[in-house]
């Protein structure tokens, strides 16, 4: 009986997280919503506490699904992203804090401890791998075309703000919210792979398509692991935004080859 209950709890969480695939990859909202309802309903039957937390995740996913995630650098597009993505973080946070009276979702910016050699080393590895691999992916696969063409200074500035703002939001939602809620009920690696499904699905609609998941899956899993290890939002944000800085430079270079022409692995731009 205990094994059946554990399996049902895992299935409930898997249904909620798997809903991100039809919601953001296949853009089939009804299927995604059905999976969310099924996952939360199953959790209600087997573990009410889990159901409360899965409902928070489901609520955030529904909020995100109300808009297209395709990059849009217009005033209206950036405002829409800011409002909707902020709501997707604030809704679960406020409900768990003031309705559930819990303190599961937290944003631990500083740990009070200096970075370890591991942390400096990991950041260095991320920068080197990003510099070498990301040009091959974005330019070689043509995925850079999933972002608007930027040639003017104002457009480039908007792209910089947008890429970094979404990168910060990724950590607030996928790590500090989804991963933290799942971690209350499942072992670290189980919770981590479940949040990675949501993380990677979101990134797919955002533009990381073609063979992008070969990069985004390990990145999402590693970010969860690093947060679990360091307990530092500041550190995982630093890693993420360092990665995003390279992405920004590649996107600008792909549209305007004379700019940021520093990538030795960049294929010829088609």
What is the predicted function of each stretch?
Residues 5-22, 56-63, 123-132, 192-195:
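Alpha-helical transmembrane segments
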Residues 50-54, 152-155, 186-193, 209, ...:
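Membrane-helix interface segments
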Residues 111-117, 168-194, 228-232:
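Membrane-interface helix/loop boundary segments of multi-pass membrane proteins
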Residues 72-85, 93-166, 257-268:
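Juxtamembrane helix-loop-helix connectors linking adjacent transmembrane helices
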Residues 21-99:
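Alpha-helical transmembrane segments in multi-pass membrane proteins
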Residues 192-196, 200-204, 208-267:
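Functionally important transmembrane alpha-helices
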Residues 30-41, 82-90, 156-160, 169, ...:
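Membrane-embedded alpha-helical segments of multi-pass membrane proteins
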Residues 1-33, 158-163, 181-185:
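Alpha-helical transmembrane segments and their cytosolic membrane-interface
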């Amino acid at each position: 009986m205990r094994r059946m209950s554990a399996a049902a709890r895992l299935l409930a969480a898997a249904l909620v997280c798997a809903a991100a695939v039809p919601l953001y990859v296949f853009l089939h909202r009804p299927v995604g919503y059905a999976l969310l309802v099924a996952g939360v309903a199953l959790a209600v039957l087997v573990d009410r506490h889990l159901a409360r937390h899965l409902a928070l995740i489901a609520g955030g996913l529904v909020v995100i699904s109300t808009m297209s995630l395709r990059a849009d650098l217009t005033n209206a597009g950036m405002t829409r992203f800011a409002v909707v993505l902020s709501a997707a973080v604030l809704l679960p946070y406020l409900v768990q804090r003031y309705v559930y009276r819990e303190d599961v979702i937290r944003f631990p910016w500083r740990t009070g401890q200096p970075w370890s050699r591991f942390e400096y080393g990991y950041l260095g590895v991320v920068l080197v791998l990003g510099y070498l691999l990301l040009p091959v992916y974005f330019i070689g696969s043509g995925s850079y075309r999933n972002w608007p063409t930027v040639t003017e200074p104002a457009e480039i500035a908007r792209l910089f703000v947008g890429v970094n703002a979404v990168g910060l939001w990724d950590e607030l939602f996928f790590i500090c919210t989804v991963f933290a809620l799942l971690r209350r009920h499942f072992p670290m690696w189980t919770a981590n792979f479940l949040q990675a499904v949501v993380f990677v699905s979101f990134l797919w609609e955002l533009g990381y398509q073609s063979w992008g998941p070969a990069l985004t899956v390990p990145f999402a899993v590693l970010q969860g692991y690093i947060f679990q290890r360091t307990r530092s939002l500041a550190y995982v944000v630093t890693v993420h935004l360092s990665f995003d800085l390279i992405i920004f430079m590649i996107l600008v270079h792909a549209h305007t080859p004379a700019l940021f022409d520093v990538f030795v692995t960049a294929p010829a731009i088609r």
